[in-house]
């Protein structure tokens, strides 16, 4: 089974390395191109390995209608009209050129979730390195096929999809390539920590026989993302906002630059502790015990509880040999407080 998926010259998904961090800009620009470009700058500055945007026009997702069926009935966007919500949140196609130009200048990797075939065409013009398929688009097999045919790595979010839908999607992509990363995701906005279901990462890994599993996290903090690191994910995605006080369509479950810095620091430390080996070092000998002479022991004298003791540091025979040498005899004179070695024993 492959252990790496190359993204570009500088990045790869690697099961032996720290999870890559994706900063999802989404609609946190509030319709301002200036803020949009600034979000890319700040995400890069905060340490995001990849920066993701969303490529669609409202007409790629819904119909302009004021009928009741086109209004959201619960959650964060309760009573919002679909068309108006996507109009507010979308990143205009005309902004993409400057976004990719900025990413190139910053030497960061910018990519996107396309929501239509024409969006894929636009992204191909900008030579994206990879794609993300949103969980709500996983059943749009025309879109899946269009993305798969680029033969670029695809990150698949699974939040709103059934196992059969995920499987059908994977089968289609595998006709073209196997550079697939599967994300565990809960499509609640925001997701409560008690509903994060982080253990599902292991289920997805086993179910789809993949090393390349990640997390798209919609909780309001970074705890779930840090916990996922211990389950050997290759990527973690968090929505990103310009500051703690920012107000936008996704701001409730987005993190600030300060939190992004913390996230990278914490997952780096967790990953470090997971891959570290408990190797013996010269330092620990000072905290281990070995056998010493309690008093001067004469040549041919027996070792007894009265003349040997286990003390620190470990310079001679390990303390575990204590009972084995009792009643054996010394080959030579051993001075008081000297360590006892194998060569000292008959």
Please give the residue ranges for each predicted region.
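Catalytic cores and adjacent flexible loops of soluble metabolic enzymes
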Residues: 1-346
């Amino acid at each position: 089974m492959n252990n790496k998926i190359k993204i570009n010259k500088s990045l790869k998904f690697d099961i032996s390395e720290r999870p890559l961090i994706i900063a999802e800009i989404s609609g946190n620009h509030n319709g301002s191109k200036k803020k949009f470009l600034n979000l890319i700058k700040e995400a890069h500055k905060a340490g995001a390995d990849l920066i993701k945007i969303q490529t669609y026009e409202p007409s790629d997702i819904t119909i302009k209608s004021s009928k009741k069926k086109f209004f959201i009935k619960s959650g964060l966007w309760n009573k919002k009209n679909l068309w108006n919500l996507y109009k507010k949140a979308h990143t205009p196609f005309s902004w993409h050129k400057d976004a990719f130009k900025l990413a190139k200048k910053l030497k960061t990797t910018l990519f996107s979730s396309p929501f239509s075939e024409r969006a894929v065409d636009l992204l191909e013009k900008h030579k994206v390195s990879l794609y993300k398929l949103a969980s709500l688009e996983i059943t749009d097999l025309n879109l899946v096929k269009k993305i798969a045919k680029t033969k670029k790595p695809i990150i698949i979010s699974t939040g709103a999809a059934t196992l059969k839908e995920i499987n059908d999607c994977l089968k289609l992509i595998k006709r073209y390539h196997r550079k697939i990363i599967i994300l565990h995701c809960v499509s609640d906005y925001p997701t409560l920590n008690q509903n994060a279901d982080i253990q599902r990462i292991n289920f997805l890994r086993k179910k789809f026989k993949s090393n390349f599993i990640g997390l798209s996290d919609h909780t309001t903090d970074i705890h779930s993302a840090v916990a996922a690191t211990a389950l050997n994910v290759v990527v973690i995605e968090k929505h990103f906002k310009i500051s703690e006080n920012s107000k936008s369509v996704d701001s409730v479950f987005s993190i600030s630059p300060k939190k992004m810095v913390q996230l990278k620091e914490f997952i780096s430390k967790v990953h470090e502790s997971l891959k570290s080996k408990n190797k013996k070092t010269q330092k620990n000998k000072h905290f281990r015990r070995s056998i010493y002479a309690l008093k001067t022991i004469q040549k041919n004298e027996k070792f007894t509880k009265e003349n040997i003791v286990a003390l620190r540091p470990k310079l001679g025979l390990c303390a575990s040999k204590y009972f084995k040498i009792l009643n054996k005899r010394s080959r030579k004179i051993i001075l008081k407080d000297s360590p006892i070695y194998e060569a000292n024993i008959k």
